[in-house]
């Protein structure tokens, strides 16, 4: 496994790889969710490139950029065990040199939910992912379903800009009690960690209502909110039952929908989702 920090060196190393290449972009502090993406990429491609870059342009001024967890030696040991070919771990100045001024606005798909709660977030995500695609020239790129809106944003960008990359979305990996794996889970104290299962419980509640025949969007959203409101340490940022393609809130679910939520547990903001399917 080779660890590379400059774009020039990465391009030289990439040019030497024959066959198909899978890209797994990450912000580091890897967990089993990330590793599931790496294993999928390993199974489906001749070579795997993983990137580790805490991207400052996707964090708002009051968000957790400076305290976002980092442990590069641990990450590299995990990736070596998975037989990753190349790891690209650039500095901020390598990705955003002085004078950098080009950003990607993906349009309406980036506006609701996470886009509304975190203005500018998807502008930063789309820009860095587009740059990583340009630098690594992958055949396929792997993302987790936990960041459902992000996957839609990246699909839209890839389609609109005619980028020759297949976007592969992989299932959410959960702890035994249902909490979706996230690098931010490390922020939770033991009491908050117990309370954080409220996200999974809320999704389970909406799935049960849907399975019982409920199709009214407001009723389904209320089912999630009731579970969150019953947890003293939890505060909902949003609950959503939305169209899977454009994320507009549904009055009635006729076929499939994305149920998603963002919840603050203490000072930690967590997201999760599931697909409702008849």
From Swiss-Prot:
> Which GO MF terms does the UniProt record name?
ATP binding; pantoate-beta-alanine ligase activity
Where does it mainly reside? Answer: cytoplasm
Q: Name the CDD domains on file.
A: PanC (cd00560)
Task: Provide the residue positions that the database annotates as binding (R)-pantoate.
Answer: 58, 150
A single cellular component GO annotation:
cytosol
State the pathway, as annotated in the record. Cofactor biosynthesis; (R)-pantothenate biosynthesis; (R)-pantothenate from (R)-pantoate and beta-alanine: step 1/1
Q: Name one GO biological process term.
A: pantothenate biosynthetic process
Compartments annotated for it: namely:
Cytoplasm
Which keywords appear in this protein's UniProt record, sorted alphabetically? ATP-binding, Cytoplasm, Ligase, Nucleotide-binding, Pantothenate biosynthesis
Q: Give the residues the record marks as binding ATP.
A: 27-34, 144-147, 173, 181-184
- Binding of beta-alanine occurs at 58
Q: Which InterPro entries match?
A: Cyt_trans-like, Pantoate_ligase, Pantoate_ligase_C, Rossmann-like_a/b/a_fold
Which SUPFAM superfamilies does this entry report, sorted A to Z? Answer: Nucleotidylyl transferase
Name a Pfam family for this protein: Pantoate_ligase
Catalytic center at which residues? 34
What catalytic activity does the UniProt entry give for this protein? (R)-pantoate + beta-alanine + ATP = (R)-pantothenate + AMP + diphosphate + H(+)
What is the superkingdom listed in this entry's lineage?
Bacteria
What EC number is given for this enzyme?
6.3.2.1
Q: How does it assemble?
A: Homodimer.
To which protein family does this belong?
Answer: Belongs to the pantothenate synthetase family.
**Miscellaneous field:** The reaction proceeds by a bi uni uni bi ping pong mechanism.
PANTHER family, per the entry: CYTIDYLATE KINASE/PANTOATE-BETA-ALANINE LIGASE (PTHR21299), PANTOATE--BETA-ALANINE LIGASE (PTHR21299:SF1)
Name the job this protein performs: Catalyzes the condensation of pantoate with beta-alanine in an ATP-dependent reaction via a pantoyl-adenylate intermediate.
Q: Which HAMAP family match?
A: PanC
What is the name attached to this protein's record?
Pantothenate synthetase
Source species of the chain: Roseiflexus sp. (strain RS-1)
Q: Which gene encodes it?
A: panC
